[in-house]
């Protein structure tokens, strides 16, 4: 269990360049039915920012 938590913590967060929303893989995103532990890279290309609707390509990595 500790190994899984450290893997999730190592995943990068991404910020929407349109509205500033931050996707945190450790938390996931309930509004889009994205479970905790889902890396940004694994989100489908059709995934949109839950705050403003921007496309996935409008996000930039943090950290």
From Swiss-Prot:
Pfam families: Rubredoxin
Rubredoxin-like domain residues: 11-62
Cofactor(s) it depends on: Fe(3+)
Annotated SUPFAM superfamilies: Rubredoxin-like
Keyword set, alphabetical order: Electron transport, Iron, Metal-binding, Transport
InterPro entries on file: Rubredoxin, Rubredoxin-like_dom, Rubredoxin_dom, Rubredoxin_ET, Rubredoxin_Fe_BS
Gene Ontology terms, MF aspect: electron transfer activity; iron ion binding
Record note on cofactor: Binds 1 Fe(3+) ion per subunit.
CDD domains: rubredoxin (cd00730)
Binding site for Fe cation: 16, 19, 49, 52
GO biological-process terms attached to the record: alkane catabolic process
Keyword field contains Transferase: no
Described function: Rubredoxin is a small nonheme, iron protein lacking acid-labile sulfide. Its single Fe, chelated to 4 Cys, functions as an electron acceptor and may also stabilize the conformation of the molecule.
Family: Belongs to the rubredoxin family.
Protein name per the record: Probable rubredoxin
Annotated organism of origin: Methanothermobacter thermautotrophicus (strain ATCC 29096 / DSM 1053 / JCM 10044 / NBRC 100330 / Delta H) (Methanobacterium thermoautotrophicum)
